[in-house]
Amino acid sequence: MWSKAAPAVLVLLGSCRAQPSEPHFPSAHRDVAPIVGGVFSTEDARDRMGEAEQVMQLAGVKPGMSVADVGAGEGYYTVRLARVVGAKGRVLAEDIVPEVRDSLSERVQRENLDNVAVKLGAADNPMLPAQSFDRVFLVHMYHEVQSPYAFLWHLREGLKPDGLVAVVDSDRPVQRHGIPARQLKCEFAALGMDPVKFSMLTGGDAYYMAFRLARPRPAPDTIQACGA
């Protein structure tokens, strides 16, 4: 018969078991921009340029879709995506800064966005539920990702088989808070994703590029870093 100490013994034995090691990913082999905050520009300025409307049209966002806004910040895209996908659609807004996540949660509640969920992710893993999203948006944030290969390796699992990753960034050096389109294409290709659409956005140097799943997810130790 087990004594009263038995549960503690079981816990101790369990803790002694070898834990699976974290997969090893290649480093970026390029500059990574520092995180400068959750606001890229004022919402009024972005609305005047029609940025969100351009991007959502290019991405083919429709009512009833499930979409993720990764690196959502203060929620400029989150609230606009919520309106387009409607009551039958879903938006997951993710950020890695707890205070930003909390502020966005308050906004979602204040604006009664019942089709939006807010969650905290990690710098190298947005922690998206598997095969859940028609579109995953990365808007003016990818150049700040410290471990792009780990990030994309995890992120691609959140896509439905016919889903797309929609990236918006500026066509300029990473040091100036952008990423050249050629570099972006190379890094996505390393994770088995190919571009399906590219367009320069009006009103600045920002571009839109969408990617689909083209090949199986590679093992982390087989990923070939761009520029390595």
Question: Each PLM stretch: what is its role?
Answer:
Residues 68, 73-126:
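Class I SAM-dependent methyltransferase SAM/SAH-binding core
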Residues 134-148:
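A short SAM/SAH-binding and catalytic strip from SAM-dependent methyltransferases
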Residues 199-228:
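Core SAM-dependent methyltransferase catalytic element
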Residues 82-83, 149-164:
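A short glycine-rich, Lys/Arg-flanked "PGG" loop and its adjoining helix->strand segment in the class I
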Residues 17-68, 76, 106:
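Class I SAM-dependent transferase core
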Residues 124-136:
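A short acidic, Gly/Pro-enriched loop at the edge of an enzyme's catalytic core
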Residues 63-64, 87-88, 159-165:
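Short glycine-dipeptide loop
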